[in-house]
């Protein structure tokens, strides 16, 4: 997973609340067995509307999604996070996330920053008045800068650390390879063990 420190990208105002994971990526797009290639399914039900925000310049090149409250609720599909990332989003800001979505985001490398609703509305206003406005998200300081406005966001310390270090679950496990090997070496012979792959 790529480490995240600071990201600057075009802000996208998604003025919708209660966006569940089925709206983020409908179930019909979940047939792949890989983690990539889901960008076409992102908001598929809405992208048929020519006036949908991601169909408009310059928002179709956005990388910071500023969403309404209750973003990512519903089923626990990781594909919702993968679709956002495949499209190009690095950050999603909302005043409230579905808990499972927020956890999946952090594990995959997508920043899900909690921002007060009044600050979300300020960001919407600034972006809509200045299409193409770039937002800078600083994970170290937990701030979002839009022009001269600076707003704070919340993210738990553990997820923040993982993102700053670029550690997904596999990366965390690989940090413990020596300890795992020492544990396996000390296991009694009569206990089950994982066999080395044969050549």
UniProtKB/Swiss-Prot annotation:
Reaction(s) the record says it catalyses: (2R,3S)-3-isopropylmalate = (2S)-2-isopropylmalate
Enzyme Commission no: 4.2.1.33
GO terms for MF: 3-isopropylmalate dehydratase activity
Keyword DNA damage: no
GO CC terms, sorted: 3-isopropylmalate dehydratase complex
Keywords: Amino-acid biosynthesis, Branched-chain amino acid biosynthesis, Leucine biosynthesis, Lyase
Superkingdom classification of source: Bacteria
Pathway: Amino-acid biosynthesis; L-leucine biosynthesis; L-leucine from 3-methyl-2-oxobutanoate: step 2/4
Pfam families reported in the protein's UniProt record: Aconitase_C
GO BP terms in the entry: L-leucine biosynthetic process
Xref: InterPro entries: 3-IsopropMal_deHydase_ssu (IPR004431), Aconitase/3IPM_dehydase_swvl (IPR015928), AconitaseA/IPMdHydase_ssu_swvl (IPR000573), IPMI_Swivel (IPR033940), LeuD (IPR050075)
Family: Belongs to the LeuD family. LeuD type 1 subfamily.
Job of this protein: Catalyzes the isomerization between 2-isopropylmalate and 3-isopropylmalate, via the formation of 2-isopropylmaleate.
HAMAP family per record: LeuD_type1
SUBUNIT field: Heterodimer of LeuC and LeuD.
Protein name as catalogued: 3-isopropylmalate dehydratase small subunit
Organism whose genome encodes this protein: Mycobacteroides abscessus (strain ATCC 19977 / DSM 44196 / CCUG 20993 / CIP 104536 / JCM 13569 / NCTC 13031 / TMC 1543 / L948)
